[in-house]
From Swiss-Prot:
Function: Transfers a GMP moiety from GTP to Mo-molybdopterin (Mo-MPT) cofactor (Moco or molybdenum cofactor) to form Mo-molybdopterin guanine dinucleotide (Mo-MGD) cofactor.
Protein known as: Probable molybdenum cofactor guanylyltransferase
Reactions the enzyme catalyzes: Mo-molybdopterin + GTP + H(+) = Mo-molybdopterin guanine dinucleotide + diphosphate
Source species of the chain: Bacillus mycoides (strain KBAB4) (Bacillus weihenstephanensis)
InterPro entries according to UniProt: MobA-like_NTP_Trfase (IPR025877), Molybde_CF_guanTrfase (IPR013482), Nucleotide-diphossugar_trans (IPR029044)
Gene Ontology BP, a term: Mo-molybdopterin cofactor biosynthetic process
């Protein structure tokens, strides 16, 4: 059976939100604690990629390793975070989750894992016609592709996907659970997510 690890991305600036999203309250804890807890039920190892400014606070909240982007790739967005996590944990597959998708379910991680196979480099959902590359699974062979992109100063997840053999998932499992894939980018979206939570 393939080994699978989790990489939680919490290295963004949260500029639209106005404060670090990883530390925002959610279900009697925080976004980052919630995402790690969801992942812990499905993967063997987890690492959190944190922004420098909040690393110590994140370390106090979660019981998994917390690291920053590798120094020479800092500031290069999600690709830098993903490859830093891949370097930290040696695994066959990596489940990527952002810290700002509070509705994500361990059921989704199970679906991702079921779809992985050696013929693919990545497994990515399509929600309402849009690819969601940060709620996806990547094989470790993708690491070299990321390095090549970063060396060319290319930071786009789309550029990575264009170089990969990707299995896209857009079936009923995904479309019936679009809430799993909602990102919270603004205070307004956060307020709405809390309302939706209280109405469940």
């Amino acid at each position: 059976m393939s080994k699978c690890a989790g990489i939680v991305l919490a290295g963004g600036m949260s500029s639209r939100f106005g404060e670090p999203k990883a530390l925002v309250g959610w279900k009697e804890s925080t976004f980052i604690e919630h995402i790690v807890k969801v992942m812990e039920s499905a993967v063997q190892e987890i690492v959190v990629i944190s922004h420098t400014d909040i690393k110590e606070r994140v370390e106090q909240l979660v019981q998994v390793p917390v690291i920053e982007d590798m120094s020479h790739y800092k500031g290069n967005g999600p690709l830098a975070g993903i490859v830093s996590g891949m370097e930290y944990i040696d695994s066959d597959w990596y489940i990527i989750m952002p810290c700002d998708a509070p509705n994500v379910s361990n059921e989704w991680i199970t679906i991702l894992l079921e779809q992985t196979s050696n013929e693919y480099d990545a497994v990515v959902p399509i929600i309402n016609g849009r690819k969601q590359p940060l709620l996806a699974a990547y094989h470790n062979r993708v690491k070299e592709k990321i390095y090549a992109l970063l060396q060319e100063e290319k930071r786009s997840m789309g550029q990575l996907l264009s170089q990969c053999n990707v299995k896209y998932i857009a079936g009923e499992d995904v479309q019936a659970n679009v809430d799993w894939f909602i990102n919270v980018n603004t205070k307004e979206e956060y307020v709405q997510a809390q309302k939706d939570l209280s109405n469940e």
